[in-house]
């Protein structure tokens, strides 16, 4: 799958779950499970409930997402 196939959306963290997984509410109202991307994990970027994030969804599974950016 190429990078052109991903769907980028904005969302807000609702709650922390185990294993660096988060429940994210997207701007269209859907709630998905999101995990931190490798670069964010490598640079120890902390994510807390209430943070605004950018997530990437694949067209194959719209219930899971990858968190790629945390807004300041």
Swiss-Prot record:
GO molecular function, one term: ribosome binding
Gene3D superfamilies registered for this protein in UniProt: Nucleic acid-binding proteins (2.40.50.140)
Residues in S1-like domain copies: 1-72
PROSITE patterns: S1_IF1_TYPE (PS50832)
InterPro entries (alphabetical): NA-bd_OB-fold, RNA-binding_domain_S1_IF1, TIF_IF1
One GO CC term on file: cytosol
Subunit structure and binding partners: Component of the 30S ribosomal translation pre-initiation complex which assembles on the 30S ribosome in the order IF-2 and IF-3, IF-1 and N-formylmethionyl-tRNA(fMet); mRNA recruitment can occur at any time during PIC assembly.
Family indicated by similarity: Belongs to the IF-1 family.
Name under which the protein is recorded: Translation initiation factor IF-1
Species of origin: Methylibium petroleiphilum (strain ATCC BAA-1232 / LMG 22953 / PM1)
Species lineage: Bacteria, Pseudomonadati, Pseudomonadota, Betaproteobacteria, Burkholderiales
């Amino acid at each position: 799958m190429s990078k052109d196939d991903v769907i980028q959306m904005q969302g807000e963290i609702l709650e922390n779950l185990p294993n660096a997984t988060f429940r994210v509410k997207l701007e269209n109202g859907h709630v998905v499970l999101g995990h931190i991307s490798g670069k964010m994990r490598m640079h120890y970027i902390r994510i807390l409930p209430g943070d605004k994030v950018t997530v990437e969804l694949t067209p194959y599974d719209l219930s899971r997402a990858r968190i790629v950016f945390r807004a300041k």
